[in-house]
Amino acid sequence: MKQKTLTLTQLYREGAKCLGDAGIGDAALDAWYLLEYVTGISKAMYYADPDREISEKNVKRYETYIEERSRHIPLQHITGEQEFMGYSFYVNEHVLIPRQDTEVLVEEALKVIRPGMRILDMCTGSGCILFSILKMEKERYYVSNLEGMGVDISKESLAVA
């Protein structure tokens, strides 16, 4: 039995069509993001060699992720990661996905935080807000005596943080 081989272009087009048919708003972008996630191939590499064949293992992984995304599962829950304030955070279905809007909260907090303060992050979820504040404060002063604690009622969320 002959194995199914697909090129980058074929796989990407199939993924984008499937997501479009499922009503995903940014179908082409999401299909690209998942292709890059599975293969590790950048856009530059894609355009340099669009007919590169993809291993059967990666084809299956990509098709699985496309199927999940077509059921409107968020990309971040599929990949398990989300960038926030320049840092990559692990996320899953037990925490809210960090949003760019929330980065403003971190920026505003950094304006009023002073050395020696203690921070309590209630409903910490992924921990991205507290971690970002502590990390950025340390980068700003090279040394920081800030203390922080994240708490959450959800054991599953705390396992993520």
Which role fits each region the language model picked out?
Residues 2-62:
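A short N-terminal interaction module
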Residues 12, 31, 62, 72-75, ...:
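A general structural signal for well-ordered alpha-helical segments in protein cores
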Residues 20-23, 39, 70, 113, ...:
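Secondary-structure transition/hinge residues
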Residues 36-112:
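Conserved AdoMet
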Residues 103-161:
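Conserved SAM/SAH cofactor-binding pocket of Class I
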